[in-house]
């Protein structure tokens, strides 16, 4: 990893490591035969994950039902996040982004339809945000708030997570994260074809609740991104999939070069093909 961070710094860049625990979005073959863990023993419906167990043909299979995390499990995972943050800084990263979105473990606590716990980690919005807060607090204490960002996905249903009242839940999450003075909040918008726009009232509420740097990502191009920043909705715009097929994306945007399409079939499994083998623009 130090080779990567050194290379980024040599080019004058800043690099954060995105830290995530997938929770129930995995398979026993990927974790030494153990049963996956989650906020609750609720299987993610219609979700497949990539496995390569050395015996069967590598490919995508259905996830299994997870087991509900105990209090000791929760403490252990909080500690794992704390140590992961320290490891990232030691490896030369400038900071970390806590991936609390896209249906992964922390999102499985936040969203009401994935969390049916009856203890202090389930039920009310405050309770469902508790695990998020404990992880953030541990990482802030370990490496400093100015090195911690958080990614949320309020309106997606990725990997089977859905919240009954996303506006209320995620406005509360923004205000909660503001208490920890994290450096930024990164919000992933829904970005499938014909996806609805994120409500403007929600964006205004998040802007009011969170005083750090705001980043939005999802279906943005250079024009939409510039407009969002100019309107004060966000401070920065993130690009994900366009970067996969366009390793020189900033230059392509700056000079108006055409963007190469990515292959969606190679995004979530396999090796280098379709992930790190796209060329820079050659004219």
Regions found by a protein language model. Give the residues of each.
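Flavin-dependent oxidoreductase catalytic cores
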Residues: 1-283
């Amino acid at each position: 990893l130090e080779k990567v961070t050194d290379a980024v710094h040599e080019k004058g860049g800043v690099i954060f490591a995105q830290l995530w625990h997938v929770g129930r979005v995995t398979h026993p073959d990927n974790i030494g035969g153990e049963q996956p863990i989650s906020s609750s023993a609720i299987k993610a419906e219609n979700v497949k994950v990539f496995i390569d167990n050395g015996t069967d043909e590598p490919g995508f299979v259905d996830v299994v039902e997870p087991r509900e995390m105990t209090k000791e499990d929760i403490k252990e995972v909080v500690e794992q996040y704390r140590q992961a943050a320290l490891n990232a800084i030691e490896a030369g990263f400038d900071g970390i982004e806590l991936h609390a979105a896209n249906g992964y473990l922390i999102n499985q606590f936040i969203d009401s339809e994935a969390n049916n716990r009856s203890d202090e980690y389930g039920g009310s919005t405050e309770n469902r945000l508790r695990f998020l807060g404990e992880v953030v607090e541990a990482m802030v204490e370990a490496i400093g708030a100015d090195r911690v960002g958080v990614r949320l996905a309020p309106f997606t249903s990725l990997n089977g997570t859905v919240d009954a009242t996303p506006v209320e839940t995620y406005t509360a999450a923004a205000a909660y994260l503001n208490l920890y003075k994290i450096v930024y909040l990164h919000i992933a918008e829904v970005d499938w074809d014909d996806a609805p726009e994120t409500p403007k009232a929600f964006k205004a509420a998040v802007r009011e609740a969170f005083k750090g740097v705001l980043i939005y990502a999802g279906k943005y191009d250079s024009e939409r991104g510039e407009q969002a920043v100019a309107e004060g909705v966000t401070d920065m715009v993130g690009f994900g999939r366009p970067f996969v097929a366009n390793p020189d994306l900033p230059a392509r945007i700056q000079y108006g070069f055409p963007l190469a399409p990515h292959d969606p079939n190679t995004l979530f499994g396999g090796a280098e093909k379709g992930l790190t083998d796209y060329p820079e623009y050659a004219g």
